[in-house]
């Protein structure tokens, strides 16, 4: 028999053998979001014997949303390897009707059927589910190539830039956490075009954890001894994740950011032998220079159709759907 329970601490995730393929599916990540990110967990757990599935959520206004922030590339249900996902998710969907009238799930990966599984379960549980694309994920499938072969497939302008500028910049890539290098990264980020770091303590603690586990790849580019560009990557399960990158204005004439990116790709492809490079969310044009494929990120907006506050949302969705239909000639 399936039992559904609710928890205001993420500790419950640590006691379960939940499968985690990405940094954003580990219990430690949700602990960081709660402890350093300042978020208040609302974890929904369905269990049937040894089978379990969890939805790490939080309250936002009158709705439930994923326990996530801007550092999270994606979000999805966490399950034990043998879990009956449809049955457990449907049980959660039915029970959540007692807790809220609206739940928004995003950004959900398109490629692993998490979005379709959630949508089917919540529709079976009596929810009206609105689905849309909310973001874009740029990736590179290495497909056994060496870095040299990969670089040969890049645009000619990029290869020319690297030939002209590579010798003017010194690059280093660390796989362990170094406080001095991290301070250099923070200084570069603070003086770059990027907005102020939202949760610097959380990001540092994440970097420390990844460094202790051997997953950190922290790159720094220097010119005449001064750090002018930095990138924060991690490597896990044959995938390299590009978390943060920044450079100061003085780095632009030297193309230091480009030179550092090339060094990071070389480390990931030839050094770490990854199968995939994940550039996170955001459809920035520069990502297309390095990456070869995009994947959709999905938003599911789930409403209880009998609740009055749901009616305006459902009405607007109906109007948009009708307006998008081709008109008869």
Where in this protein do the model-derived segments appear?
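Active-site/acyl-donor-binding loops of N-acyltransferases
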Residues: 59, 120-149, 272-329
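A general structural signal for short secondary-structure junctions and capping/turn motifs
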Residues: 33-36, 94-97, 128-131, 268-269, ...
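Short, high-confidence coil segments that cap the C-terminus of an alpha-helix
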Residues: 39-41, 98-102, 216, 272-274
